[in-house]
Amino acid sequence: MSKKIIQVVLKENIQKLGKSNDVVKVATGYARNFLIPNKMASVATVGMLNQQKLYAAIKEKKIIFAKENARKTQQLLEEIQKFSISKKTGDGETIFGSVTEKEISQIIKNTTNVDIDKQNILIPEIKTIGLYNIEIKLFNQVTANIQLQVLPESN
């Protein structure tokens, strides 16, 4: 006896099946007895499939738009290339505390008016005066490399 298969639209992410709003083929019994009663999916009608195509096209346009913005931000940051921050120093070139992602994000915002989430900034441990390479993840496969000049704070 062969399995009967039905198309459903997922309403939430289901491991090993798909993500929310995906159209997937599942066994009729699985859909009728588990997915639909638990409001995890609904039967894919012609209208729903058309709506899914429209949703996918809009999502694709948003991704393209976000990637273009990320590339523009990358160009802007790499044109400036070097950002500076002043920190209080102790003995020699050692600074008090360290430079954080939040501080770098604030410097970039003040300089370029571009808001970058601190979680997307990858920095080495900065404890001394000097020049450091910073990597900023802007989008999938779009990163900007900048330099951060840590200077002693003048009194």
Curated annotation (Swiss-Prot):
State the InterPro entries in the record.
Ribosomal_bL9, Ribosomal_bL9/RNase_H1_N, Ribosomal_bL9_bac/chp, Ribosomal_bL9_C, Ribosomal_bL9_C_sf, Ribosomal_bL9_N, Ribosomal_bL9_N_sf
Q: Name one GO cellular component term.
A: ribosome
What top-level branch of life does the organism fall under? Answer: Eukaryota
Query: Where is it chiefly localized?
Result: plastid
Q: Does the keyword Iron apply?
A: no
**Transmembrane parts of this sequence:** none
Question: What keywords would UniProt list here?
Answer: Chloroplast, Plastid, Ribonucleoprotein, Ribosomal protein, RNA-binding, rRNA-binding
Provide a GO biological process annotation: translation
GO molecular-function terms, A-Z: rRNA binding; structural constituent of ribosome
Localization per record: Plastid, Chloroplast
Its biological purpose is as follows: Binds to the 23S rRNA.
Family to which this protein belongs: Belongs to the bacterial ribosomal protein bL9 family.
NCBIfam families for this protein: L9
What name is this protein filed under?
Large ribosomal subunit protein bL9c
What organism is this sequence from? Porphyra purpurea
